């Protein structure tokens, strides 16, 4: 399905839309921060790498397993880019997607991530027809854990030392919800 048919998505305070070339500076601002990447098992990218990464997301397909739909999250009152949400096709055959999100820490603590992720999960179930949507989170990322728990996702797994960055092993939690569970949640 062409994203143009269901975008932008408007919530009470936010707009989820395709990234635009004019978003590069704000995108780079949070994508080069250590405090953003500490739970992503990677070092912040260089300025050149951010530009390459940004150019790729502008034209990224969303049709096959592994493809990712990344949406800019802006405040509706001033169009400030505050982060992004994503849906990654985990299995087209099994109708499963992974939800993810990255936000500028300057805007944390205001419920924006919860509001945006709620809209993205709803898009996944109601418009795109997924059966199951899951999130993979670093076990130490308490803010992110709070987001998925507030949304009613169920903790399904605790993966022990399943990823490594900078010589340090990290644990991950898997949270998920099914379409029927999401439909019956408040």
Regions found by a protein language model. Name each.
Residues 61-66, 153:
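Short loop/turn motifs at secondary-structure junctions and domain boundaries
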Residues 1-38, 73-186:
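Acyl-donor (CoA/ACP) binding surface of acyl/acetyltransferases
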Residues 59-62, 109:
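Short helix-to-loop capping/linker segments positioned immediately adjacent to catalytic or ligand/cofactor-binding
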Residues 35-58, 67-71:
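Conserved GNAT-fold acetyl-CoA-binding loop/helix
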